[in-house]
Amino acid sequence: MYDEDVDYSGNLCMFLDSASEEEWAKWLPSGIFAGVTTNPIILERDGRECNIAALTELAKEALAYDAVQEFQVQTWGKTSDEMWQNGIALAKYDPDVIVVKVPGTFEGIKAANALVTDGIRVTITAAYASHQAVLAAAVGANYVAPYLGRMNDAGRDGFGTIVEMQKTADKLDSDMRILVASVRNVGDIAKLAAAGCDTFTISAKVAEDMFGDPLTNQATLDFEESATRIGAYREAEEAQERARLEAKAAEAAAAAAAAAEAAAAAAAELEGGSKPDEDDARV
C-alpha cells in the first residue's frame, strides 16, 4: 500500500496497464509493479463497467494485492466540472492510493487544477507533445502520461518527445513523474530508462516479454539440467521415496491389523455358535 512517509521519487516505478483480474493475479506478485493503471478503453477491453460504483469495487480488488501502492483510474465528462465531480467520487474510496487520470485538454487541465486543490492526486493523460509536461507541472499534477507508441504511429518522434519531457521535469525541479504509456516493446523501456525515464506502465504482453528472453530461458534450462545431474534434487527425491515407503508400510500394517481383527471376530463368532445350550446339557 502507499505510504505517505516514503519518498517514491527517484526510484524506478512500473505499473501494470490492465483491468483484468487474471492478468493481475499473474503479474502483480512478480515484484516489479507498484500499481495498476486503467482507462475507459482498457475497462471496455477487459469487460469492466465505467461508473463510480463499479470502479470503486475495481479499486478494492486491485488494492487487495500487497504490491499495489497506487491505483490509477480515469475520470470522464464533457466539462471540467463534470470531470472534477467524477474525479472526487473516484478518489473518495482512498485518496492516498487512488490517482485520478485527466486528459490534457483545456477542460481537463481546469479539472485537474481543481482536483489538486482538493488534495486529489492527478495524472495528466493522453499527452502527445513536450509542452504538455509544462502544463501538467503548472497545475501540480503527480504524473503526465505520454503515449509513446501512438506518437510514433502518428509520425511523431515519440522517444525524443518523452526524453524532452523528462528533461523539462528535471529542470523544473518538479516531483512530477513522466509516466510513459503505450509502450509496445521492451527495447523502448531500456532506451528510455537509459535516457533518464523512471516510470512506465506496460501491458501484460510487454510484461511477458520482460521476462521472456529466449537465451535467458535456455541458460536456465541448462543450469537445471546440470544441477539435476550432480544431485541438486537427490535429497528431495530420497525424502519422497522414504515417505512413499513409510506410507506403504503403514498401509500394509493397517491392512494386517484389520485382517487380524476380522479373524478374531470370526473366531469369537464360531466359538459362540458351537457352545451347547442349557437344555442340551440336562439330557
Residue locations for each model-derived region?
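Catalytic beta/alpha-barrel core
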Residues: 15-17, 72-78, 96-105, 121-134, ...
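Alpha-helix-loop-beta-strand connector modules within alpha/beta enzyme cores
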Residues: 56-70, 93, 109-118, 160-178, ...
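Glycine-enriched alpha-helix->loop->beta-strand junction motifs that scaffold or abut catalytic
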Residues: 31-35, 94-97, 114-123, 138-145, ...
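C-terminal helical cap(s) of enzyme catalytic domains, especially alpha/beta-barrels
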Residues: 209-233
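Active-site beta->alpha loop and helix N-cap motifs at the rims of alpha/beta catalytic domains
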Residues: 10-24, 29-32, 38-114
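Catalytic cores of alpha/beta
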Residues: 22-28, 86, 131-138, 184-197
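Glycine-rich phosphate-binding active-site loops on the catalytic face of alpha/beta enzymes
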Residues: 40-44, 144-153, 197-216
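Conserved, mostly hydrophobic/aromatic
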Residues: 39, 100, 136, 192, ...
